Amino acid sequence: MNQLNALKQFTTIVADTSDIESICKYKPQDATTNPSLILKAVSSSVNKRFIDQAIEYARKKGGSYNYKIVNASDKILVDLGVEILKHIPGYISSEVDARLSFNKEKCILKAKKIIDMYEEKGISRNRVLIKLAATWECIKAAEELKKNNIACNLTLLFSFAQARACAESNVFLISPFVGRIYDWYLSQNLILKNPADQDPGVLSVCKIYDFYKKYNYKTIIMGASFRNVQQILSLSGCDRLTISPVLLKELESSNKELNRKLCPPTSFLNPPVPLTEAEFRWEHNQDEMAVQKLSEGIRNFGKDQLSLEKIFSKLI
């Protein structure tokens, strides 16, 4: 049995791509997208029909020039998601504009709009996860959205404080970024390249997993942003792992033995008192890496969203 199929025995595999061919090949349960992947998809001639559909939709909706651009951007996000859902049995994760990451109310409105657009295409909200950056505002938005049966995927998660706040707000799923944590420690010369069991990104997810399972939190942990197969193998047994096509191929090509690394306990403890907003901000602020990477991630996803809108600005 190859490592990909072995991993599927105790971890749900999610494809970190909007490429339909890769999704069909590796047969993941779910798929995730982000502004960078959407921008990449839009840049491919294969997806020209989605661009045309988005422009037509925006023109029909009318409104100001800027309003049309926003509607076109939302439409292509949803249409690509609908197409991906034809090839997977589970969830598609679609991301809210990162520029809204510090505005709870606007995140809620955008999330509801995206869900409405999916439902207009006949897709149940039970198959869509709304991706939000794991800021305090977005965590609280996700908590409120869940009351409307809208499940969220809290992304750009780098600190233990973020993970704890998500669990305490009962969000559906988190995406701790293994590779980006590793990148930061490597860039600071704080670790050796490929440190195996001492990989700080892997250790971060292990700590979150142990905390969640010890206190029986229901939030799903989906490790993300992998740089190599060893990081993935070190997290075998994690609830979910979202993996790029390149690393899915590498796993499929290997028949080496794979052992489960993460296992849930058989008994639980009563959870601690939830963090207040002030406690969350202080604890997160104590983690230099997390502060830098969250800020950088929001900025970069914001830039990609702006690039997508610039493409539509020339076509509408």
UniProtKB/Swiss-Prot annotation:
A single Gene Ontology CC term: cytosol
CDD domains per UniProt: Transaldolase_TalAB
Record-linked Pfam families: TAL_FSA
Enzyme Commission no: 2.2.1.2
PROSITE patterns named among the record's database cross-references: TRANSALDOLASE_1 (PS01054), TRANSALDOLASE_2 (PS00958)
HAMAP family: Transaldolase_1
Protein family: Belongs to the transaldolase family. Type 1 subfamily.
Protein name as annotated: Transaldolase
Gene name of the encoded protein: tal
